Regions:
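Acidic donor-binding/catalytic loop of UDP-sugar-dependent glycosyltransferases
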Residues: 45, 94-106
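Acidic donor-binding segment of Leloir-type glycosyltransferases
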Residues: 24-64
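Short aromatic/hydrophobic "clamp" motif used to bind/position activated sugar donors
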Residues: 87
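Glycine-rich, basic loop-to-helix element that forms the pyrophosphate-binding segment
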Residues: 66-82
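Conserved short acidic donor-positioning loop in nucleotide-sugar-dependent glycosyltransferases
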Residues: 15, 27, 40-42, 69, ...
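A conserved hydrophobic helix/loop-capping motif in glycosyltransferases and polysaccharide synthases
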Residues: 7-19, 23, 30, 38
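Flexible acidic/His/Gly-enriched loops in nucleotide-sugar-dependent glycosyltransferase catalytic domains
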Residues: 56-58, 73, 102-155
Length: 155
């Protein structure tokens, strides 16, 4: 019997293997999780493809493109392989907190079409938090248009 995939994490990647590994490491390894990495034509002078992050991990699928068309293109490629009920789109330089699955599992059987999670922006060199203007704008928009938008949850 095939295990149902609840979450597909689709990660575009280009030339930051150390950050991609951190991202992968922050995603719990569970049978209901699929991790899809789409490398968008990384430079072989920067990336060692024989030791590519996630390549030998059971729940990780790695796809390579030669086009170099950007993160959106890579995400669309990943969508063609996604099997989950829910799609998550971290960037390669993102990483999750340890309570990620506690939050996600609250919504796994919900009827929402979209759940938007705010994120913290951190300056990596100093580990200093900074304002996340985009999250503030999205939250404001969603709260101001509740009558027009159905089945969206802002967490």
């Amino acid at each position: 019997m095939e295990i149902e995939i609840n979450y597909s994490f689709i990660i575009p990647h280009r030339n930051v293997p150390h950050l991609l590994q951190r991202c992968i490491d922050s995603i719990p390894k569970r049978d209901d999780i699929q991790i899809i990495i789409v490398d968008d034509n990384s430079d072989p002078k920067i990336v060692n493809f024989e030791c590519f992050p996630g390549l030998n991990e059971k729940c990780v699928e790695v796809y390579f493109t030669k086009e170099g068309k950007g993160a959106g293109y890579a995400r669309n490629i990943g969508l063609t392989y996604a099997k989950g009920k829910w799609f998550l789109f971290p960037d390669a330089d993102d990483h999750y907190t340890t309570d990620l699955m506690n939050v996600l599992d609250k919504y796994v059987n919900s009827n929402y079409d979209i759940i938007y999670f705010a994120c913290d922006h951190i300056i990596e060199k100093t580990m200093e938090h900074c304002d996340n203007i985009i999250s503030i704008q999205i939250k404001s928009y969603l709260e101001g248009h509740k009558d027009m938008i159905n089945n969206i949850r802002y967490y």
